[in-house]
């Protein structure tokens, strides 16, 4: 059972459907079932309430077990899962949502996302239509997308008249997604960043380490703080309890404008995850 008073208070943001979502959460991509259970329990213990999983991760059941072990009431949690590309389609997406709910042991998810637009598959608009149905039936409180470009985002909005609540995209100092953030904002869509820690590639960067030293923070904390100060929601992945606790401890300082600018100058367009224009996996 978790302590009654969590150690970290995480702010929330209001989505375009009036639901609220924590600004910072734990992702469990590429974690084994055992790693997932331990990571989720560690995160919940220190005050995290947003857990981000996906059908493609193969660990929804592990998330369910960790949540059950925590003793935290379902209503206090924000659980995200994602539609796998092979399940895209109007009816298939609804069936996939129900299958995810079965694995999660839940009646609803707080946020259901299309994992990838997968343009070569040509089903993301139909999949979005199915997700609208799932929301209408109460199986998903909010619905959104991942890895959508402006073209993909405009297509589903124009064809269904329903705007995603969230667009979760790869976003870090090497790929600051300035144009996509502006596009999301124009559509009143929250930008949620993933891979914010750059897979560890900037931890020895002299700009980052100098800024971290100035604030008495870790490079990871500075990376997360930079992302939050851009106005993004963020999910990060970690399997280590001490890193999870440290990474949620980012709400007691603010980066100065010159430090934000220095971080912004690291942008070079490096993409660490697949190109959403061509990728047909996950």
UniProtKB/Swiss-Prot annotation:
Mention one GO molecular function. aldo-keto reductase (NADPH) activity
Name listed for the protein in its UniProt record: Aldo-keto reductase ML1669
Alphabetical list of SUPFAM superfamilies matching this protein:
NAD(P)-linked oxidoreductase
Top EC class for this record: oxidoreductase
UniProt keyword terms in alphabetical order: NADP, Oxidoreductase
Q: Which residues form a coiled coil?
A: none
Q: What PANTHER family has UniProt attached to this entry? A: 2,5-DIKETO-D-GLUCONIC ACID REDUCTASE, NADP-DEPENDENT OXIDOREDUCTASE DOMAIN-CONTAINING PROTEIN
Which residues participate in NADPH binding?
197, 235, 237-239, 246-247, 273
- The organism's superkingdom is given as Bacteria
- Assigned EC number: 1.1.1.-
Annotated Pfam families: Aldo_ket_red
Q: Active-site positions, per UniProt?
A: 57 (proton donor)
Family to which this protein belongs: Belongs to the aldo/keto reductase family.
Q: Is this entry keyworded Metal-binding?
A: no
Organism from which the protein derives: Mycobacterium leprae (strain TN)
């Amino acid at each position: 059972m978790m302590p009654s008073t969590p150690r970290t208070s995480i702010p929330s943001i209001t989505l375009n459907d009036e639901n609220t979502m924590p600004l910072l959460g734990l992702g469990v991509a590429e974690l084994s079932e055992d790693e997932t259970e331990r990571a989720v329990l560690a995160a919940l213990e220190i005050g995290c309430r947003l857990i981000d999983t996906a059908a493609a991760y193969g660990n929804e059941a592990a998330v369910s077990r960790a949540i059950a072990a925590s003793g935290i009431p379902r209503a206090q949690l924000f659980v995200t899962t994602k539609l796998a590309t092979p399940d895209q389609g109007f009816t298939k997406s609804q069936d996939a949502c129900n299958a995810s709910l079965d694995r999660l042991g839940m009646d609803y998810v707080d946020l259901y996302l299309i994992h990838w637009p997968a343009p070569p598959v040509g089903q993301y608009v139909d999949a979005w239509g199915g997700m609208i149905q799932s929301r209408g039936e109460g199986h998903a409180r909010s619905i959104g997308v991942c890895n959508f470009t402006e073209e993909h985002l405009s297509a589903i909005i124009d064809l269904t008249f329903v705007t995603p609540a969230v667009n979760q995209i790869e976003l870090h100092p090497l790929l600051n997604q300035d144009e996509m953030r502006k596009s999301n904002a124009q559509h009143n869509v929250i930008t949620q960043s993933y891979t914010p820690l750059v897979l560890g590639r900037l931890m020895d960067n002299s700009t980052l380490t100098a800024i971290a030293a100035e604030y008495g923070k870790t490079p990871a904390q500075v990376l997360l703080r930079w992302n939050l100060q851009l106005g993004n929601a963020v999910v990060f992945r970690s399997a280590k309890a001490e890193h999870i606790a440290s990474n949620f401890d980012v709400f007691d300082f603010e980066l100065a404008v010159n430090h934000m600018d220095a971080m912004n100058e690291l942008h070079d367009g490096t993409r660490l995850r697949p190109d959403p224009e061509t990728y047909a996996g996950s």
